[in-house]
Amino acid sequence: MPRLRSPLLTAAAALAVLGSLAACDGDKSKSAAMADSGDPLAQYRANPKYKAFMAGEKMSGYVFASPETQAMQDDDFENPGMLAVQDGEEEWSKVEGAAGKSCASCHQDAAKSMKGVAVSYPKFEPKRGKLANIEHRINLCRTEHMKAPELKWESKPLLGLTAYVEHQSRGLPISVKVDGPAAPFFEEGKKFYYTRRGQMDIACAQCHEQNPGMNIGVENLSQGQSNGYPTYRLKWQSFGSLHRRFEGCNQEVRAEPYPRGSDEYTNLELYVAWRGNGLKSEAPSVRR
Amino acid sequence: MAADIKPRIRVPQTAKKDEIIEIKTLISHPMESGQRKDSQGKIIPRKIINKMTVAFNGKPVFEAKLEPSISANPYLSFFLKCSASGNLDFTWTDDDGSVYKATQAITVA
């Protein structure tokens, strides 16, 4: 039963980390590590290797990963996320739907047409009257331009196409826009980020804004940046979407998750992407 | 399902005589352990790659027995010293009897 986890233990671990932090704030001399620099992120800032994975004070999840996980991401051959990119490459030129077209029929060479696209998503999509992320955008092209059915969220072909499109922006800085028609959706996402939820009554910000660099159970808390997504997650033993990660983070505090692809998670995705504006895309990343 | 299983290899195309080269392999495979249950509580049958072998010009140079606790998409790498040019043949054996193969030539100069 390798998948069995105790929610109570997880809850206790999370409360323990937040509790111990409160104590550290009260009396900094208590903790040697804290007294050293007063900042658990100082070690990452000081490491020149991480320069490419930072933008000012923003740090990619890569920085917080173990050397073994980093090595897996660094080598495209070892990186199992590249298998999803390969799947997507095959999907790209597959003819489907009543219009008799493939993605390639209209967008030709993805290396040119899709370069820099994914780092500007989610964005306001007039056809939806709300935000679209890359998955939504792909499905819009399927229904409208290919006359093909939508691909199911988290299905192999949709994960593959998302990975393939995102991969064309690897190395480019995240650069979402949050003004104009996107503004009200951004505000919704921001509200979500700061709202305490679940039985443990904890907001995203309390873990990822206030406590990065601290341990939570066996995990090293990161800033919760999205520049590596979609990602190959070792715990999942598979490739997965950012919304799947959001779902896990909601469950972590024993809150009811929203459906993947929902407006709530898409607005949140814009807020999270904006927090990371300037960080370079790592799609596909490898995470624990 | 079987269409999803793809072996990948990375082998230098050329090597100097007696140079030690690194061979990397990865096969996309779920490595279902046989220990997990589905939502109905029924055991999901075991299906793993249980063996991987490599031969150089027909002579075995590497063999691994894989067990159910090994992660999905098993990655294996090893080092090899070649004194002559030849073919490396890779074989992965699945619980269901399927055999997946890959081949690459190395020119030793």
Question: For each predicted feature, which ranges?
Answer:
Chain A
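Post-cleavage N-terminal segment of exported redox proteins
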Residues: 12-15, 19-84, 112, 122-187, ...
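Bacterial N-terminal signal peptides that target proteins for export
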Residues: 1-11
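Long, well-ordered hydrophobic secondary-structure segments characteristic of membrane-embedded
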Residues: 80, 86-92, 100-105
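The canonical Cys-X-X-Cys-His
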Residues: 100-111, 161, 189, 199-211, ...
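Short cysteine/histidine-rich zinc-coordinating motifs and their immediately flanking basic loops
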Residues: 114-121, 216-222
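An amphipathic alpha-helical core segment
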Residues: 205-232, 236-239
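Extended intrinsically disordered, low-complexity coil regions enriched in Ser, Thr, Gly, Ala
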Residues: 98-104, 217-220
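Surface-exposed interaction/gating patches
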Residues: 89, 95, 163-215
